[in-house]
Amino acid sequence: MAIDLPPVIPPQASTAERIEQYAALHSENIVDVNIGDYTLKISGNRYLSREQLDMIMSAAQSPAQAVSALNQAYYQLGHLLVTVYFAQRENTIFAHVINGKLAAVKAPDNIYPYFSTLIGDKDLQKSEFGSKQVLANLKSDRAGLDYAVSYQVGGDPEAYTLVFTEKPKADYDSTDLDFSVNNFGNRFLGRYFGNASLKHDFKSGVEALFSYDRALTELGEVNGGDYYDGYTFRLNYPSSFGLYGLEARYIEYARDADVSLTGDVGGDAGGNSTGLCTLALICDVSEALLGLDLNGLGSGTPLFPSPDGTNTTLNLYSETKSIAFSGEQVISSDSFQRLTTSQRLEKIDSYIEVKDYGLALDEPHTSLELGVKYTKVMRLFGFGTQLTAQGLLEAGLEADAGTLGTDSREGVVATGRRTGEFLIFKPRGGLKMAVADWASVKWDVISQYSDNKQLPLQQQFFLGGGSGLSAYLPGVLVGDSGLYTKLALESNGLPFAGLNFTPVVFVEYGQAWYEDAAGSAGDVRAIADAGFSVKLELGKTFETELIAATPMYDDNLDEKSLSALEVDFFWRLKLNF
């Protein structure tokens, strides 16, 4: 850790006369406790009840143990600036508790603002220090600095100064260059992808990241894809008020889609159309994977004029641009719990264009997301456990434009029925329990619930591939609302031929549905699978992972379409420099 937690202040030797004099002026009552042949007189106590004192003293075998246990109890309860002064007169031990206040902070300029707001605190708690420590740690790590924390006390025994001593961090590396390849696929096209990312930490605490994603169409299984390029730029800074950042993304791809239409091409994409779309791996779940209504747009207008039974190839081009401002604040933090709040304001402009037709999807929208997250470390059923609970609420702020809100039909799922004026609740939770020295049980839940509105493409809930449900390609389940849960038994890491070997077995369940849809279009579609993963790591330099799963259950899904999206395994390889 870049910044140490302030150490426990050891008991301080004094004289019986001085303690008696000080206790007479600063203590309302004195507690007498018998320890063997000795009487321990405790004065100045503010934070321990008589029951707590009796419990602490009952475990002590000697006066020295009693004084040490009393001193340690205050620290364990989170009171950092409490000191026990002690002295002995024959068979009487005097113990006076000094409840200090933070009078000053001595620290280098780059971290002083993080802790200066604590000055004047008359009962400095671990959680108060910890809430400042989290952000200061982040900045110090990025700057390559460590800090040791100590105390200074002057003439006033109740006035403490926190002193931060700086030293360079050993083996500091401010830049990471990563290259990775995988076959996780993408919701819209392709199976094989490559990524290159560059991250640099500045001495000021600013972190900058640039990432490039590319579909490796040369390796096959392109799923109709021509190319896919994605660019991400991220910048953030841990100020004394919170972690604030900027993120910009740009994605473009092109693909061909072979379509055969018969009968009425003016139907909807909610399962009520008489049109027949035969795009391999796509059209049976066309709304899910392409994000648009291949059979119609708006109130049933065909995407393109086509005689009955004509085979046509659609040339699709898609572009998505987004910019987001984010913030996260630490409300409370110590060794056992942390409470944070977050905000994210995002502007997204996304469209899909069909050659010789024009825009088939145009979804500009702005959203504000507010969140709260709580993490706690505890013992549950005798096992060390970490619990996480998070709630996010996202609201669409922009009036409908483009293709949003252009379809007045009721009960169908269609591109024009989506709206940018939405409200989404995203509860999430997690549990990690150390059931053995070598293994942990993990349970994670991710969900999303829309307020009976059909959502823009970029806000939809989808599963498959790296997003969960590892027996299928990305986009096997898509909806406005949904839920995903995973239960896993995970190794804590085992040595293997100089590598760190992490095997995992798991079961997964996911469901998704479209809102405000009638009939089968609004059905809850569900999938469950079970599988394993194996990860090998060589420090930070090399990492590879294999994931394989087999289907266990499905509901309200076409078996032919589902089997077309089934995969044998996923893998990824990552190198770090």
Which positions does each model-derived feature cover?
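Post-signal-peptide, soluble extracytosolic/periplasmic N-terminal scaffold domains
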Residues: 1-170
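Outer-membrane beta-barrel initiation region
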Residues: 63, 83, 103-241, 273, ...
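Transmembrane beta-barrel strands of outer-membrane/channel proteins
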Residues: 149-151, 177-183, 196, 208-214, ...
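Residues that define the transmembrane beta-barrel architecture of outer-membrane proteins
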Residues: 158, 190-194, 227-231, 319-323, ...
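Short loop/turn motifs that connect adjacent beta-strands in outer-membrane beta-barrel proteins
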Residues: 170-174, 203-207, 238-245, 332-340, ...
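Outer-membrane beta-barrel translocator domains and adjoining extracellular loop/strand segments
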Residues: 189, 220-230, 256-267, 272-276, ...
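C-terminal outer-membrane beta-barrel translocator/porin domains of Gram-negative envelope proteins
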Residues: 353-501, 505-509, 513-515, 520, ...
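Outer-membrane beta-barrel "beta-signal"
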Residues: 536, 541, 563-577
